UniProtKB/Swiss-Prot annotation:
Its main location: secreted. Keywords: Cell wall, Cell wall biogenesis/degradation, Glycoprotein, Secreted, Signal. Involved in cell wall beta(1->6) glucan synthesis. Pfam families: Kre9_KNH, Kre9_KNH1_C. The keyword Glycoprotein applies. This is Cell wall synthesis protein KRE9.
Length: 276
């Protein structure tokens, strides 16, 4: 990719992958069983917005697919619904739901899970999977015997870019000015990485942040406290060059050799053991 010098002055790119993202699926529950009624199978999918970026308001469409197989070899049997907009979802307090319906002849009996693909226009996507459930009394030809206890790991691939010709990024830059220890959201923002100075002038150690109390959960929490940390890109450049100086022929001339005896603070002594 070639960037024109005058068209883009500054670019900040954030790429977040393999994190929980925007959705925390709560239904169907693990080991749930569904069977057709009137030739149609209905599987309600419910999830909560866990507060991580992107929020559900940023998602343009959802795609629901029926999948089976091991976590490292996902086999999506069919797309159950595509281009479902957020307005087509049912919302009850903080729980969003969509009922996926399909014909009983679509597939055979077996263990399945539903893939929830959320599209964020111009930025990327998130993928989540429901817990595994059973389909029984199906009329399809192909039955699946594979069984497992966990669903595939969710994935998030979101990219936001800010240029001098674009609108402000959806990530508020002021988020990076809030001290990390005072942030409470599931997506936290770290300060820009800086380069060390050429000299160390400090003579004593100082703590950057004050100490804080530690509390432990006695039961499982309903939502993750923290899903990811976002760090801004550098607003500066580092120049470097090749050292063209001809090295000396001997290591000692280059400072890469020393006499071992000069590094010893104590000398070894020989002790003669007297026979008894």
């Amino acid at each position: 990719m070639r960037l024109q010098r005058n068209s883009i002055i500054c670019a900040l790119v954030f790429l977040v992958s393999f994190v929980l993202g925007d959705v925390n699926i709560v239904s169907p529950s693990s080991k749930a069983t569904f069977s057709p009624s009137g030739g149609t199978v209905s599987v309600p999918v419910e999830w909560m917005d866990n507060g991580a970026y992107p929020s559900l308001s940023k998602i343009s469409t959802f795609t629901f697919s029926l999948c089976t197989g091991p976590n490292n070899n996902i086999d999506c049997v069919a797309v159950l619904a595509s281009k479902i907009t957020p307005s087509e979802l049912t919302q009850d307090d903080k729980v969003y739901s969509y009922t996926a319906e399909f014909a009983s002849t679509l597939t055979g009996n077996g263990q399945y899970y539903i893939q929830v693909f959320a599209q964020v226009d111009g930025q990327g996507y998130t993928i989540h999977y429901t817990p595994r459930f059973q389909l029984t009394s199906m009329g399809g030809v192909t039955a699946y015997t594979y069984s497992a206890t966990t669903e595939p790991t969710p994935q998030t691939s979101i990219q936001t870019t800010t240029t001098n010709n674009a609108q402000a990024t959806t990530i508020d830059s002021r988020s990076f000015t809030v001290p990390y220890t005072k942030q409470t959201g599931t997506s936290r923002f770290a300060p820009m990485q800086m380069q060390p100075n050429t000299k160390v002038t400090a003579t004593t150690w100082t703590r950057k942040f004050a100490t804080s109390a530690v509390t432990y959960y006695s039961t499982f929490g309903s939502l993750p406290e923290q899903a990811t940390t976002i760090t801004p890109g550098w607003s500066y450049t580092i120049s470097s060059g090749v050292n063209y100086a001809t090295p000396a022929s001997m290591p000692s001339d280059n400072g890469g050799w020393y006499k071992p005896s000069k590094r010893l603070s104590l000398s070894a002594r020989k002790i003669n053991m007297r026979k008894v």
